Amino acid sequence: SAAMGPNDSSLSTQVGGVDLTYKWKPLEHNTYKSFTWQSEIFYAKVQKTENIQVNSLGLYSLMSLQIAKRSFITARYNYAQDVNAPAAVLMAYSATYGWLATEFQKIELEGKMTEQPNHSQTYEAWLRWIFVIGTHGAHQY
């Protein structure tokens, strides 16, 4: 997809992106195994002044592997250039273990390392409880 239009400087900005997804499930035992690989890339071209144009890029790629009926592991990579300073790059790596407690609840444990544009690193750990309320695809109400 793509879009273009005027920006704050009354000049033009163009943005675009492409998303690719691959999903695999075996014909047999397909409630116990699956694999998804999803990647997306974004591009921005911003005309700041008549003489200054800034181009920036961002992307992510993730792979998710179902290792049991209710368990998944996921790895993700992020890359982003600052739209105002493309030399400033942020990169992040994460790994997640997810468990489907029920069809309405998912519990995830995630570790993430982010490398800031100044090359400092931050480390995070998250425990998430995701729950669904209301109408969903499994039941018609």
Residue ranges and their predicted role:
Residues E50-N51, S64-Q66, R70-K112, Y141:
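Outer membrane beta-barrel transmembrane domains
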Residues V18-L20, W99-A101, Q121-Y141:
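Outer-membrane beta-barrel "beta-signal"
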Residues P26-F35, R70, F104, T135-Y141:
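Short loop/turn motifs that connect adjacent beta-strands in outer-membrane beta-barrel proteins
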Residues A2-P6, W24, I41-Q47, Y77-V83, ...:
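Transmembrane beta-strands of outer-membrane beta-barrel pores
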Residues S12-V18, Q53-L59, V89-Y93, Q121-A125:
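Residues that define the transmembrane beta-barrel architecture of outer-membrane proteins
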Residues S1-S56:
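Surface-exposed beta-loop-beta
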Residues S1-T13, G17, Y60-Q66, S71-I73, ...:
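Glycine/serine-rich loop-strand microenvironments at binding/catalytic pocket rims
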Residues V18, K33-S39, I73-A75, A95, ...:
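Transmembrane beta-strands of outer-membrane beta-barrel proteins
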